[in-house]
A protein has these predicted regions:
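Positively charged n-region of N-terminal signal peptides that target proteins for export
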Residues: 1-4
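C-terminal motif of bacterial Sec signal peptides marking the signal peptidase cleavage site
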Residues: 14-16
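Conserved functional acidic sites
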Residues: 19-191
Length: 191
């Protein structure tokens, strides 16, 4: 028994000292978060947002009302799915792995519309009237409308919470014109 335990310890220690062919010690750090961490999709999870668009403000309640085979449907009819590549709705990946600044991906949402996404910041503090969080990620997406106009969407997500803020602007001739804003007012985790 003692010799088996000693042998196991030696194997573990030897593998911890393994080197790559270049001679350096190989250490792989697990990512702090994966995309699914930023979209809690359990039945009963609920959010309340202030939605501001074209000068009008309203409260928007959202709740996960159905989950089947990993596909979560919310009270607005949106469907989300977390998979090995990230979290997507029915048309696009909203967040892709790895969760690192500079991660980029494209979504073809129609024959004439391609959205370009980029994680622009990770491990950031973020806040809204619902609270303060650490480890937040900021994702920017761009969708070119024509030669001079581009819609820009910036989404801030907190781990275990979801979307904290989202702002859409119209980039026109170098100017950014605000279009809509979503701010988290209240978050209720699944029971």
């Amino acid at each position: 028994m003692k010799s088996t335990l000693l042998f196991s310890c030696v194997v573990v220690l030897a593998s911890a000292c393994a080197t790559t062919p270049g001679g350096t010690t190989k250490t792989e750090k697990a990512p702090a978060h994966v995309a699914a961490d930023y979209f809690p999709l359990k039945l009963g999870t609920a959010w309340e947002y202030e939605a501001a668009m074209l000068g009008e403000k309203r409260v928007l309640p959202v709740k996960i009302v159905k989950v089947f085979d990993g596909l979560a449907e919310d009270s607005t009819g949106a469907r989300l799915l977390a998979d090995a590549w990230g979290v997507r709705d029915e048309r696009r990946y909203l967040l892709r792995n790895p969760i690192e600044s500079g991660t980029k991906w494209n979504n073809v949402v129609s024959p004439s519309s391609v959205e370009g996404y980029e994680i622009v910041a990770v491990e950031q503090p973020c806040e809204s009237p619902a609270g303060k969080w650490e480890g937040c990620v900021i994702v920017e997406s761009k969708n070119r409308i024509d030669a001079s106009k581009t819609l820009v969407n910036e989404m801030t997500l907190a781990p275990g919470v979801g979307i904290v803020r989202m702002a859409t602007t119209l980039e026109d001739g170098g100017k950014r014109l605000p279009q809509s804003k979503l701010t988290l007012l209240k978050f209720t985790p699944a029971p």
